[in-house]
Swiss-Prot record:
Entry-linked InterPro entries: Chaperonin_Cpn60_CS (IPR018370), Cpn60/GroEL (IPR001844), Cpn60/GroEL/TCP-1 (IPR002423), GroEL-like_apical_dom_sf (IPR027409), GROEL-like_equatorial_sf (IPR027413), TCP-1-like_intermed_sf (IPR027410)
Top-level taxonomy: Bacteria, Pseudomonadati, Pseudomonadota, Betaproteobacteria, Burkholderiales
Binding site for ATP: 30-33, 51, 87-91, 415, 479-481, 495
UniProt entry tagged with the keyword Isomerase: yes
Species the sequence originates in: Cupriavidus pinatubonensis (strain JMP 134 / LMG 1197)
Gene Ontology biological process terms from the UniProt entry: protein refolding
Principal cellular location given in the protein's record: cytoplasm
Subunit structure, as described in the record: Forms a cylinder of 14 subunits composed of two heptameric rings stacked back-to-back. Interacts with the co-chaperonin GroES.
Protein name: Chaperonin GroEL
Gene Ontology CC, one term: cytoplasm
Recorded catalytic activity of this chain's protein: ATP + H2O + a folded polypeptide = ADP + phosphate + an unfolded polypeptide
Family recorded in the similarity comment: Belongs to the chaperonin (HSP60) family.
Length: 547
């Protein structure tokens, strides 16, 4: 086991604060509409240019072990805020730095760190309640566009694209971000349910231009096992042929003679069919088959419920207006399922989301809700170079998270004003002793810091602007993008309540931990031994004989 350095008290805290400052100073230059870029070196390929706080934070690793501990703790603030709210990482870092900086002064003056922490917690709880009070729900797509634009560093086109996507697929719909092929951003909307399984044989293709299978008003057969024997399928195929409509088979797999017979019938024009594998794996596959059954008004043919393929009738089959199958995707448009049954299924999945413990499960369940309730929108990000594309894509993803947060918990005035106004709820607070009062003061000071930093990054005098904004009331604030004072909500400078709340809570949580730290243990740096001398050129003796 390697030897450890154990550092106590002020010496440990001072080193950790140095680390906090190095990381926070690198991150906070990106805050606000006039925030600067940070260039990140890559071990291969060109450098990455970013204005995303969490991307900058993740890159920072300091040589000094104690400084690095401080930096890593603040990095945790940024990444936790990003995970919970999807945005607000820079604001959280600025708040954490301020709470640590102010708090350390009081700790150095001999105040009790535990009481400081209690004061900080009390102030944060009061501020969060105040933020919830002033929060307004997002009602219009204009507000959604404004939130998206602010989060994407005042890029209005990104905000508009996201608002348009939400209009098309609903607030529950899936919106994904992909690399575009042109210079302009594009929005592609897939209505209906899409899942990532394509045709099992290219011989099913009936639209050679698009290389897809198009089935108009088809029946849908859902089976949870493999189909390899054509004899099992014959009864249902005959019934479908009599009805004169196409058939899509969704099963675990269709292989051997069953697939060959379907292909031959398709080529000869006897029966228009297509087959795809069921989406997902294991229990998720069963659940998704059930989703498709409810969407199309059919039944999953499973031995568990006493149904077999040879006894299946047309009543067991689902129906849809149109189905399009590509090489990798299948889209079911306008399923014939009962609206009440679909709504019931969505409620059931939402209940599962509430109980889900892992982020992965939650994400997959949300996708299922979106596929049943709305549709899928793809924002294709356009840019001139790959470096610009990466940077823009990161901003679009941030904006997307911010708009989802705004839909979830509502909006507050942006530009650091919501936190500044929430100070009113704290200023009357008193703790149980002077040390707790000091903790409350720490938060009061920290809550004006985001506005100060936004103004500094815009090249203005922070104290003058903060004083003027404090004189105003309500939504009155400073719009750093235009350099004007006024009603920020009317100007479209909005922040999601969830982002502001999460940033403050996470910053206070980690900063309090640091204030109550009294000992740091780190590995002793290894002494680097001097490199060995290179081997000499032997056999060079006897120079005299050469003279």
């Amino acid at each position: 086991m390697a030897a450890k350095d154990v550092v106590f008290g002020d010496a440990a805290r001072a080193k950790m604060v140095e680390g906090v400052n190095i990381l926070a100073n690198a991150v906070k230059v990106t805050l606000g509409p006039k925030g600067r870029n940070v260039v990140l070196e890559r071990s291969f390929g060109g450098p990455t240019v970013t204005k995303d706080g969490v991307s900058v934070a993740k890159e920072i690793e300091l040589k000094d072990k104690l400084q690095n501990m401080g930096a890593q703790m603040v990095k945790e603030v940024a990444s936790k805020t990003s995970d919970n709210a999807g945005d607000g990482t820079t604001t959280a870092t600025v708040l954490a730095q301020s709470i640590v900086r102010e708090g350390m002064k009081f700790v150095a003056a001999g105040m009790n760190p535990m009481d400081l922490k209690r004061g900080i917690d009390k102030a944060v709880a009061a501020a969060v309640e105040e933020l919830k009070k002033v929060s307004k729900p997002t009602t219009t797509s204009k507000e959604i566009a404004q939130v998206g634009a602010i989060s994407a560093n005042s890029d209005t086109s990104i905000g508009e694209r996201i608002a348009e996507a939400m209009d098309k697929v609903g607030k529950e719909g899936v919106i994904t971000v992909e690399d575009g092929k042109s210079l302009a951003d594009e929005l592609e909307v897939v209505e209906g349910m899409q899942f990532d399984r394509g045709y099992l044989s290219p011989y099913f293709i009936n639209n050679p231009e698009k290389q897809v299978v198009q089935l108009d008003s088809p029946f849908v057969l859902l089976f949870d096992k493999k189909v390899s024997n054509i004899r099992d399928l014959l009864p249902v195929l005959e019934q479908v042929a009599k009805a004169g409509r196409p058939l899509l088979i969704i099963a675990e797999d269709v292989e051997g003679e069953a697939l060959a017979t379907l292909v031959v019938n398709n080529i000869r024009g006897i029966l228009k069919t297509a087959a795809v594998k069921a989406p997902g794996f294991g229990d998720r596959r069963k659940a998704m088959l059930e989703d498709i059954a409810i969407l199309t008004g059919g039944t999953v043919i499973a031995e568990e419920i006493g149904l077999t393929l040879e006894k299946a009738t047309l009543n067991d089959l689902g129906q849809a207006k149109r189905i399009e199958i590509g090489k990798e995707n299948t889209i079911i448009i306008d399923g014939a399922g009962d609206a009440a049954a679909i709504e019931g299924r969505v409620k059931q999945i939402r209940a599962q989301i509430e109980e889900a413990t892992s982020d992965y499960d939650r994400e997959k369940l949300q996708e299922r809700v979106a596929k049943l309730a709305g549709g899928v929108a793809v924002i294709k990000v356009g840019a001139a170079t790959e470096v610009e594309m990466k940077e823009k894509k990161a901003r679009v993803e941030d904006a997307l998270h911010a708009t989802r947060a705004a839909v979830e918990e509502g909006i507050v005035p942006g530009g650091g004003v919501a936190l500044l106004r929430a100070r009113a709820a704290i200023s009357a607070l008193t703790g149980e002793n002077p040390d707790q009062n000091a903790g409350i003061k720490i938060v009061l000071r920290a809550m004006e810091e985001p506005l100060r930093q936004i103004v500094l990054n815009a090249g203005e005098e922070a104290s003058v602007v903060v004083a003027k904004v404090i004189e105003g009331k309500g939504n009155y604030g400073y719009n750093a993008a235009s350099g004007e004072y006024g009603d920020l909500v009317e100007m479209g400078v909005l922040d999601p309540t969830k982002v502001t709340r999460t940033a403050l809570q996470n910053a206070a949580s980690v900063a309090s931990l640091m204030l109550t730290t009294d000992c740091a243990v780190a590995e002793t740096p290894k002494e680097e031994s001097a490199p060995a001398m290179p081997g000499g050129m032997g056999g060079m003796g006897g120079m005299e004989g050469m003279m």
